[in-house]
Amino acid sequence: MKVQIIAVGTELLLGDTLDTNSNYLSIKMRELGFDVYKRVVVGDNYDRLYKEIEEGLQQNDLIITTGGLGPTEDDITKKCCCDCLGKKMVLNEKSYAKLRKYFNEDEKAIQGNIKQCMFPEDAIVFENFNGTADCALIENNGKRILFLPGPPAEMKPIYENQVQQVLEQFATDCIISETLNISILGEWDMNERVKDIIESSNNPTVAPYFKKDKRILRITAKASDRQTALDMIAKKKQELRDRLGMYVFGENDETIEESVYKVLKEHDLSIMTSESITGGMIASKLVNVSGVSDYLKRSLVVYSNEAKIELLGVKAETIDTYGVVSENVAFEMVERMFEKFNVDCSISTTGFASGENAGLVYVGLGYKNTIKTLKLQLHGERNKIRNRVSNRALAELRLMILENVSRETF
């Protein structure tokens, strides 16, 4: 099935609002085996939208619009669709009853919003449980138009809970993609380890790419139904996991901090951070994960030399002899955490986020009194460096824990 997606709204053209809906819908169409041939943004202009829908119907089987379903004069999507298909607008009684209840029988408010209850005749209407603008699917001579709400918080639930199961009736193939997230390994190293798997995989296919400091392997399967595609992906994911081992830290949207939390929880380990260059960012990432309070026992921001000495107990002579940004200081920061606070795992960071030596960082890692340090030389602006250090430190600690637990098991 050929698909065109039309995002409606002048605010999108002006850059005031980002069109995330089209990207989301492209992924969903791919999963159904539908081919998205065109995506376009159109302002709140009747003539231009009419022309886009008219031409789209000539070239595609399904037009999906987002936005323009509100009660005001510039909400023109439904009228354009009706005019293109030669259909009348009729009142949907269920939507009307919902509107009356929403406005508590306030007749003035109801009449001001009644446009949202008008739909093309013979349309399948989907109730919007997160807003007042219901949406619909209409069909005419084998062509279909689906119009969805503009706000993503309304559009996504209505698509996933109602629309998708209707569109699945028209699907002949199902295309699904899932990803494996890989830490620490560089692009070349990762590719070398799985190069033969990538080259020999046709269905599912395996494609490597980078996204926000993550190495990602995307596995895409095409099958007659969703479950078959998922089974194919699961088998390929296991093959890749067997090859990459502990470097795989999660799937799809899972973050490194979520993966670290799982490891801490599984092995009942406490953790502490003492951060200089990262300024609490590592702890902040961990705190984003629900339940981590059971394992994150303390976090210190020791940005100044005085803080490292007074709060943590780093020796002044260590800083004077080796410099505050040094392997020795990172090591001693971890050592003092074990001595003073009795935790199972610890992370320390010290480095330069700007200036002549920007990107030079030392990370200290500790697991049950075993300590190691890591030297990093990173590039980029200040906050990018801090974020990369935080992610790398968490990834390295996770690997350190797993390697030690594995040795303890045997």
UniProtKB/Swiss-Prot annotation:
Highest rank taxon of the organism: Bacteria
Family annotation (Pfam families): CinA, CinA_KH, MoCF_biosynth
Classification via InterPro entries: CinA, CinA-like_C, CinA_C, CinA_KH, Competence-induced_CinA, MoaB/Mog-like_dom_sf, MoaB/Mog_dom
Gene3D superfamilies documented for this protein: 3.30.70.2860, CinA-like (3.90.950.20), MoaB/Mog-like domain (3.40.980.10)
UniProt-listed HAMAP family: CinA_B
Sequence similarity: Belongs to the CinA family.
This protein's name: Putative competence-damage inducible protein
The species this protein was found in: Finegoldia magna (strain ATCC 29328 / DSM 20472 / WAL 2508) (Peptostreptococcus magnus)
Gene: cinA
